[in-house]
Amino acid sequence: MRSWVIPLLLAGVALAFDAADRRVPFSVLATGLLDEPAHLATAALGLLALACFIDAPRRFYVAGLIASVAIDLDHIPLYLGLLGNQDQRPVTHSLTTVLVIALAAAVSRRHRAVLAGCVAGLLIHFARDIAEGPPGVRMLWPIRDTAWTASYWWFLAMIITFTAVRLIFMTTGIPRRRARLFQPPVPVTSSETRSIPV
């Protein structure tokens, strides 16, 4: 498959499932079957764009994809009536969750790539949730309880930006070097070493 097909396919899936999700009346099953594929495709596209700039191990990207949909498991207590306000997304949909995982990544060298991937996946997930309009996302909880919302155009701009970045940078080969993250340094081969005159 040509390398430009995948970004375009992911963009199409994200836009199609998002459009259907906005039109279908809410129900746990129907909404989940439309909302989660849209989140997954959006995250995959965003991570492809990010991969133009960083060289990270596969587990970083796998963790990002999983986190981009797994965060919605926090809705289960809401649907079971175990949380008070059912008109709001759970407070785990906030930068507090991102900060906790980012701090864990900073102190855990062994799991740093996985945790950093989770951070990336969560940020992309929250960005799309914001673009779904009300009830929005309480990003600054517990400092502020105000929900952030944006229009569909925010989501469309995300998809266009991710797709354009991936296609343009992949085609031009720029940047020529990506930042190497969460991996041991590449050993210098003998051909790369410079002889020192005696």
Which residues are covered by each model-predicted region?
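N-terminal membrane-targeting hydrophobic helices
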Residues: 1-198
